[in-house]
C-alpha cells in the first residue's frame, strides 16, 4: 500500500498549482463572481498558528466557491507601514524598509507552504511607491471634497512612541502599541471629516444582514448618536454664553452648577483673577492624569470654582461654574449643565463640594430618596414650573420646543464620533501630499506629481517631531501653484488610511495611471466574504466603510459598503494565553508542517472548535487529526487496490450493507454542504468525514467481497469533499484514481436524494408513552400496516386492556393508548 508522505506530496502539488497558474483569477468571466478576502497582516515577524487560522478559513471558502463554479478572487497583501517597523529598526539598527520586506519574504514562504490558494499576481504591499502613491491620491480626493483639513487641538500623545494617537488607539488610557500612559499635547494636525458621514455610517449598518450583530453594535456605540438639545447659558457679568448639549432637557430645572472640561479654552477665559492660581495648579495636576480613567463613573470627582456664575435661562437662577476633571473636552461641547439629583457623576461632585441637589424628576410609581442616590431614569417632572406633571418623554419634547421659541437653544443631534486624526510624527508611513508656500498657503501636490516619495536616507530616532523634518532634501521644494520656494508637510499618514482602501487595489494591483479601474472594481466589489479578527470592529472596518462611502459619493464606486458579509474568527490560545513571543507560547506552523504536513495542520485548526470561537492549542489534538488523516489515506488506497483488482464479483449488485453505506455517504455530502453554508461549521464538517471514515472502515473489514461500483463512487465523492480541507492529499488521491484533471478545478459533489431514502424503517413502539419495543417495516408500508404491526409487537402489554387510541408519528413511533 502507498505510504503517506505529506511533505513530498505537498511540495509536489504546490509546484503544479504554481506552474499551471491555477489560482490566477481572470478579470472577467461568464461565471458568477465571488470575492473572498482575509484581513491582510502587519508583517511584524514570522506567523504563528493563530495567524494561520484566518487564512485557512478564507481558503476553505475560496476553494469551496471555486468548486461551485464561481470566478473567485482570493488575493493577499501586507499592511506594511507602521510604528513596529520603525521601533524595530531603531532597536536593531536596520532600515524599516529592509526589516519589513525581509519579514514579508518569510511570511510569503510560510503561507505558500500551507497551500493557501492566493492569486499571488495580485499581491499588494502598502509601503511600496506603487501603492502609497494611491493612498496619497485618496488623501487628495478627500482634501478636494473638503473632507481633509488641518486644525490645532488637544491630542493624545504617547511619550514612548513619540507620536499622536487617535482616540481609538488609546485603551484604558494607555497606548495600545506599547502600553505607555497617554498624555495630552496641543498640536496642529490633519484630520479626515468622518463626522460628516456619521449618519450614513449608522444607516449603512442596517443594510448589512451578513455582519455579526455584536460588531454592528460596537460601531453604533462608537458613533454614539444622541438626540437632545443645545442650550445657551449666559455668563453673569460677561457678554458670553456657555453652550451645552443635553439628552435630558426635562431636567433643566434641576441644574445647580456648570462643569467645563480642563482642556477647554473656556476655562482660562472665564476664571477670575483671584481664582487663577488655584485653577492653573488644578489644570497642571489633571494634565498628568489618565483622561479616560478620570472620567469614569468610579473615579474621584474633583474641580475648582472659576469665580463666575451662569444664568439658567429657564429659571434665571445664578449657578456656579466649575472646571471639573470628569468632563471630556471631545464630547458634546466640552461643558455640561450639572443636575446632581439625576446624574451619578454630578451627584458625586455635588456631595464633594457641598452643592445643592434639586430633584426635578420623580418615579412614575412611588417616591425616591434623593439624599441616598440620584434618580437617573425617566419619570414625571416636578419642581419644573409650567412643565410639572409631564412625563419625561413629553417633557423633553416640550422643554426643547420652549427653548427654541425663546431663542435659548435648539433641538440637536450629537455624535460621540470625532473626526479621524491622521497625522503621525513618525517616519515609516505615507507622506501627506501637501506643501506650504508663504505666498499661496496650503497647496495640495498635483496628482501628476505623485507619489511624494518617502526618502530612505533619514535619521528616524523619535524626537517628538517628524523625522522627515531632518531631511533637507525632502523638506524643501517648490510651490506647485506659483513656483516659489515651499516646504513639504513632514508628517506621515496613520496606517489605517493605507488599509482603508486596499481591497479596491487588489482588483488592479499593477495599474499605474489610476488606483483602480472603475468597471473592474464595480464588477468585483463589494467583497462577498470578509474574514478577520473582531479587534478590528471599530477602527479598520469603520474607516474602510467611510472611505468607500466618500469614493462612492465622488462617483468612483457604484457601491457604498465594502464588505457584504463579515466573519470574525476566534483566537488560538496556548497555555491559557494569546500566543506571543514574550510569553514563550508560540506554535510555529513551520514546525507543525515539518512534523505532520500542512493538511494535518489545516484540518486540526478547523476541527479544534467552531471557527468563531477561541480555542486552546493541544498537541494531543493535532496527533489525533493526523491519525485520522492516515486512516483515511489507508482506506482510500485499500479501495484503489480493490477497484484495480481482477475480481469482478459484486460489480453492480447492492446488498443491504451497500445501500446503508451509500446512504451514509450521501447523508455526509448533504450535511457537509449545510455545515459550510450554514455558518462555516468546519469542525462539524470534519467530524462528519471522520464518522463516515469509521463506517467505511467497518465495511472494508467486515465485507468479504466489497462492491467495486460503490467503492469507486465513495473514492470520488470523499476526495472531492476532502479537497478544500486537505487539498494536497486530495490532489494525490485524485491523480491516483486515474484522473487527468486537477481536483481544484472539479465541481463540488451533490448528494443523491434517492440514496437517502431508507428501504426499511425502525419504529419505536410505546404503550401509554412508555417504550415497549421496536419494529422494522418496509419504508413504503402504510400507516394502517405499521399500526397493526405495532399492536402485534406490544401484545403482552395489551392483555386485558382496551385500546383507546393508536397514534402514529410518521417514520418514528407508534403510541398505543390503553385503559
From Swiss-Prot:
Q: Among the entry's GO cellular component annotations, what is one?
A: cytosol
The GO terms describing molecular function are:
aminoacyl-tRNA deacylase activity; ATP binding; leucine-tRNA ligase activity
Q: Which residues bind ATP?
A: 581
Q: Does the keyword Protein biosynthesis apply?
A: yes
What EC number(s) are associated with this protein in UniProt?
6.1.1.4
Q: Extract the InterPro entries matched here.
A: aa-tRNA-synth_I_CS, aa-tRNA-synth_Ia, Leu-tRNA-ligase, Leu_tRNA-synth_edit, M/V/L/I-tRNA-synth_anticd-bd, Methionyl/Leucyl_tRNA_Synth, Rossmann-like_a/b/a_fold, tRNAsynth_Ia_anticodon-bd
Query: Where does the record say this protein resides?
Result: Cytoplasm
Residue numbers of motif 'HIGH' region?
41-51
Query: Which enzyme class?
Result: ligase
Q: Which Pfam families match?
A: Anticodon_1, tRNA-synt_1, tRNA-synt_1_2, tRNA-synt_1g
Top-level taxon: Bacteria
Q: What is this enzyme's catalytic activity, as reactions?
A: tRNA(Leu) + L-leucine + ATP = L-leucyl-tRNA(Leu) + AMP + diphosphate
* GO process terms (BP): leucyl-tRNA aminoacylation
Please report, in chain numbering, the residue ranges of the motif 'KMSKS' region: 578-582
Its main localization is: cytoplasm
Q: What's in the keyword line of the UniProt record?
A: Aminoacyl-tRNA synthetase, ATP-binding, Cytoplasm, Ligase, Nucleotide-binding, Protein biosynthesis
The UniProt entry's sequence similarity note says:
Belongs to the class-I aminoacyl-tRNA synthetase family.
- Cited NCBIfam families: leuS_bact (TIGR00396)
The name this protein carries in UniProt is Leucine--tRNA ligase
Amino acid at each position: 500500500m502507498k505510504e503517506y508522505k505529506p511533505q513530498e506530496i505537498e511540495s509536489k502539488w504546490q509546484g503544479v498549482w504554481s506552474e499551471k497558474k491555477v489560482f490566477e483569477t481572470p478579470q472577467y468571466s461568464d461565471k458568477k463572481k465571488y470575492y473572498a478576502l482575509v484581513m491582510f497582516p502587519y508583517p511584524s515577524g514570522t506567523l504563528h498558528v493563530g495567524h494561520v487560522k484566518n487564512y485557512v478559513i478564507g481558503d476553505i471558502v475560496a476553494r469551496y466557491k471555486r468548486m461551485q463554479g464561481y470566478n473567485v478572487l482570493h488575493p493577499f497583501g501586507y499592511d506594511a507601514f507602521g510604528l513596529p517597523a520603525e521601533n524595530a529598526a531603531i532597536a536593531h539598527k536596520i532600515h524599516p524598509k529592509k526589516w519589513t520586506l525581509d519579514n514579508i519574504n518569510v511570511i510569503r514562504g510560510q503561507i505558500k507552504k500551507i497551500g493557501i490558494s492566493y492569486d499571488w499576481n495580485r499581491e499588494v504591499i502598502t509601503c511600496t511607491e506603487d501603492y502609497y502613491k494611491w493612498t496619497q491620491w485618496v488623501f487628495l480626493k478627500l482634501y478636494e471634497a473638503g473632507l481633509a483639513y488641518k486644525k490645532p487641538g488637544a491630542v493624545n500623545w504617547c511619550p514612548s512612541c513619540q507620536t499622536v494617537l487617535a482616540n481609538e488607539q488609546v485603551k484604558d488610557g494607555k497606548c495600545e502599541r506599547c502600553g505607555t500612559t497617554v498624555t495630552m499635547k496641543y498640536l496642529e494636525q490633519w484630520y479626515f471629516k468622518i463626522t460628516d458621514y456619521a449618519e450614513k455610517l449608522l444607516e449603512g449598518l442596517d443594510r448589512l444582514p451578513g455582519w455579526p450583530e455584536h460588531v454592528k453594535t460596537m460601531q453604533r456605540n462608537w458613533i454614539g448618536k444622541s438626540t437632545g438639545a443645545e442650550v445657551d447659558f449666559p455668563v453673569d457679568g460677561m457678554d458670553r454664553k456657555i453652550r451645552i448639549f443635553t439628552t435630558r432637557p426635562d431636567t433643566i430645572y434641576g441644574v445647580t452648577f456648570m462643569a467645563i472640561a480642563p482642556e477647554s479654552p473656556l476655562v482660562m477665559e472665564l476664571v477670575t483673577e483671584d481664582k487663577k492660581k488655584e485653577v492653573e495648579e488644578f489644570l497642571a495636576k489633571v494634565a498628568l492624569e489618565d483622561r479616560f480613567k478620570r472620567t469614569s463613573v468610579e473615579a474621584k470627582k474633583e474641580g475648582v470654582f472659576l469665580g463666575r456664575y451662569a444664568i439658567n435661562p429657564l429659571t434665571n437662577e445664578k449657578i456656579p461654574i466649575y472646571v471639573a476633571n470628569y468632563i471630556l473636552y471631545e464630547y458634546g461641547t466640552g461643558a455640561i449643565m450639572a443636575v446632581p439629583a439625576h446624574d451619578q457623576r454630578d451627584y458625586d461632585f455635588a456631595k464633594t463640594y457641598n452643592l445643592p441637589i434639586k430633584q426635578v424628576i420623580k418615579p412614575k410609581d412611588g417616591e425616591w430618596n434623593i439624599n441616598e442616590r440620584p434618580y437617573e431614569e425617566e419619570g414625571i417632572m416636578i419642581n419644573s414650573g409650567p412643565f410639572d406633571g409631564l412625563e419625561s418623554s413629553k417633557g423633553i419634547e416640550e422643554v426643547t420646543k420652549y427653548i427654541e421659541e425663546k431663542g435659548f437653544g435648539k433641538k440637536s443631534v450629537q455624535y460621540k464620533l470625532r473626526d479621524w486624526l491622521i497625522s503621525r510624527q513618525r517616519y515609516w508611513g505615507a507622506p501627506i501630499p501637501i506643501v506650504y508656500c508663504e505666498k499661496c498657503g496650503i497647496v495640495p501636490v498635483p496628482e501628476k506629481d505623485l507619489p511624494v516619495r518617502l526618502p530612505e536616507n533619514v535619521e528616524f530616532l523619535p524626537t517628538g517631531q517628524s523625522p522627515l523634518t531632518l531631511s533637507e532634501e525632502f523638506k524643501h521644494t517648490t510651490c506647485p501653484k506659483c513656483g516659489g520656494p515651499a516646504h513639504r508637510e513632514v508628517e506621515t499618514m496613520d496606517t489605517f488610511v493605507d488599509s482603508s482602501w486596499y481591497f479596491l487595489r487588489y482588483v488592479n494591483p499593477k495599474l499605474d495611471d489610476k488606483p483602480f479601474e472603475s468597471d473592474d472594481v464595480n464588477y468585483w466589489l463589494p467583497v462577498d466574504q470578509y474574514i478577520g479578527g473582531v479587534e478590528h470592529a471599530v477602527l479598520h472596518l469603520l474607516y474602510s466603510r467611510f472611505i468607500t462611502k466618500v469614493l462612492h459619493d465622488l462617483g468612483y464606486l457604484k457601491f457604498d459598503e465594502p464588505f457584504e458579509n463579515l466573519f470574525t474568527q476566534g483566537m488560538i490560545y496556548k497555555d491559557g494565553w494569546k500566543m506571543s513571543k514574550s510569553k514563550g507560547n508560540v506554535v510555529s506552523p513551520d514546525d507543525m508542517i515539518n512534523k505532520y504536513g500542512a493538511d494535518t495542520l489545516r484540518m486540526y485548526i478547523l476541527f479544534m472548535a467552531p471557527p468563531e470561537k477561541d480555542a486552546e492549542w493541544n498537541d494531543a489534538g493535532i496527533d489525533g487529526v493526523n491519525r485520522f488523516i492516515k486512516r483515511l489515506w489507508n482506506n482510500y488506497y485499500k479501495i484503489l487496490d480493490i477497484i484495480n483488482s481482477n475480481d469482478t464479483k459484486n460489480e453492480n449488485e447492492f446488498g443491504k450493507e451497500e445501500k446503508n453505506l451509500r446512504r451514509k455517504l450521501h447523508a455526509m455530502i448533504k450535511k457537509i454542504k449545510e455545515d459550510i453554508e450554514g455558518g462555516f461549521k468546519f469542525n462539524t464538517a470534519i467530524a462528519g468525514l471522520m464518522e463516515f471514515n469509521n463506517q467505511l472502515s467497518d465495511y472494508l473489514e467486515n465485507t468479504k467481497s466489497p462492491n467495486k461500483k460503490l467503492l469507486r463512487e465513495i473514492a470520488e465523492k470523499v476526495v472531492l469533499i476532502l479537497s478544500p480541507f486537505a487539498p494536497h492529499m486530495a490532489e494525490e488521491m485524485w491523480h491516483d484514481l486515474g484522473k487527468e484533471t486537477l481536483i481544484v478545478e472539479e465541481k463540488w459533489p451533490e448528494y443523491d436524494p434517492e440514496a437517502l431514502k431508507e428501504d426499511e424503517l425502525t419504529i419505536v413502539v410505546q404503550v401509554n408513552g412508555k417504550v415497549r419495543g421496536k419494529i422494522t417495516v418496509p419504508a413504503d408500508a402504510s400507516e394502517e400496516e405499521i399500526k397493526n404491526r405495532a399492536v402485534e409487537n406490544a401484545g403482552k402489554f395489551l392483555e386485558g386492556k382496551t385500546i383507546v387510541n393508536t397514534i402514529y408519528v410518521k417514520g418514528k413511533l407508534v403510541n398505543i393508548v390503553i385503559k
